[in-house]
Amino acid sequence: MRGVAYCLLLLIVAGCGSSEFVPGDIEIPTGFETANFRLRPITVADAEKDYAAVMESIGLIHTALLGDRWPTDSFTLEQNRKDLAKKERRFEQRKSFTFTVVSLDEDRVLGCVYINKGRRGPDAAVFMWVRQSSYDDGLDPVLESAVREWVKREWPFEWVVYPGRTAPEVSAE
């Protein structure tokens, strides 16, 4: 049943078309920094540190992505490099936006934030996860609060959904 719900959710929020998600005349926010972490666009150069975070956090990622089975236990570093290259291209093409959450010294990836095109209603769907050790340290609600405020303040969306989060919808006023 959860798989069916996830598929329906993807039909509603996933942008599959070739058009830009955010028009070219709008400047794309490039992230922000707090006292605890930095959020910035993910690149292929992040592959090894991102891979370590992903593999530490498979269960949390499956929950954050509403039952999606990515990544599998057999996910490889090379597959991660290819995945990040695709995410980097989609960012440049303005089709979707993936941000890495890193420690301030950039030594450790703490999580990831995905901003995807909405369909049939919401302008955007935002998914996020933090690595297991950061989750255990209480980073998840801190990240969620900071991301919600940043999206509301910096992005050109009127209706944003946060699937799987306690307050799933935010409408800008």
Regions found by a protein language model. Give the residues of each.
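A short acidic/glycine-rich loop-to-helix N-cap element
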Residues: 135-141
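Bacterial N-terminal signal peptides
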Residues: 6-14
